[in-house]
Amino acid sequence: MDYYQWRKKNRRRKRNLQTKKPLNYALKLLKYRVRFEDELRERLKKQGFADEEVESTINTLKKQGYLDDEKAAYLFALDEMRLKLFGPRVVRMKLKSLGVDEEIIERAIEKALEEIDFHEELKRLKGRFKDRWELRDYLYRRGFDPSLIEEILNKIDGGEE
């Protein structure tokens, strides 16, 4: 084995040792996107780390501010509502399926609803539909509450006149 092969082999071994640590693996996962506590716990356990190591890693990340379910839920709700135009009902179901606490979900959705202006988004969308009923059905399927749909449609219709 020549020097270059030996060096390559040692680099690979060193890299494997570094990624075997649960904290390094968790930080690697968090580098790509914000994750929820339960989601990260499952990923670490699936990787084969012991329960004590997983809990210690999660506590460390919480203390350092890398892991915050409330912030993650808010960012998730904001993205789903703003970019994918999902309503609160669908966002609530998605967050529940990710294992987020009910109180955190409600606060995140309220905060996201305060920040988003659906009226401008839906004004552009209105041209795709023949009439008001089609748009109403579309919004209901996307997870908007009937009262919110009526409020939005009234503002859109009021703004055109």
Curated annotation (Swiss-Prot):
- The signal sequence is none
Q: Which Gene3D superfamilies match?
A: Winged helix-like DNA-binding domain superfamily/Winged helix DNA-binding domain (1.10.10.10)
Name the cystine pairs: none
The Gene Ontology biological process terms listed for this entry are: regulation of DNA repair
The record, for InterPro entries, names: RecX_HTH_1st, RecX_HTH_2nd, Regulatory_RecX, WH-like_DNA-bd_sf
Top-level taxon in the UniProt lineage: Bacteria
**Where does the protein end up?**
Cytoplasm
One Pfam entry name: RecX_HTH1
The reply to whether Cytoplasm figures as a keyword in the UniProt entry is yes
Q: Which residues form a coiled coil?
A: none
Entry keywords, A to Z: Cytoplasm
State the protein's purpose: Modulates RecA activity.
Q: How is this protein named in the record?
A: Regulatory protein RecX
State which gene encodes it.
recX
